Amino acid sequence: MSEQKPEQDVNKKIEELEKKVQELQEQLEKTKQAVKTVASILDNHLKGQWTLEDVKIAITHINEMVQLLTQSGIIRPGSEGSGNWLQMMLAQQFMQQKQAQQSQDVQIEPLKKKNKKKLKKFLDEEAEEEE
């Protein structure tokens, strides 16, 4: 009988750990979904013109994502300001993408001879179809 009690304790501990693993996996799944959602929202915003309201919404989503990552244990609060670091990285990425999007001085590479021939052939075919 004394041998059964330690075995029961071990089984109980295993069940508790399995339950904890399942809870953590559910939290991770929610976090992944939140990250995907925020990424798609930011991507949609970057495709359009940004207004002050858009920036406020993006910052709110960034802060929510940091909070979710902290809650799920992916980043630890107080560990050298990892939340602030992540916010800075996301904000920096946003600014770089926004600047690239609004850049007016787009440079066009000169066409290579091969591509010039293809373009001329295509334009000639288009002209023939119109006639």
Curated annotation (Swiss-Prot):
Coiled coil recorded as keyword: yes
Keywords: Coiled coil
Pfam families: kleA_kleC (PF17383)
Coiled-coil regions, chain positions: 4-44
InterPro entries: KleA/KleC-like (IPR035338)
Superkingdom, taxonomy of origin: Viruses
Identification of the protein by name: Uncharacterized protein 33
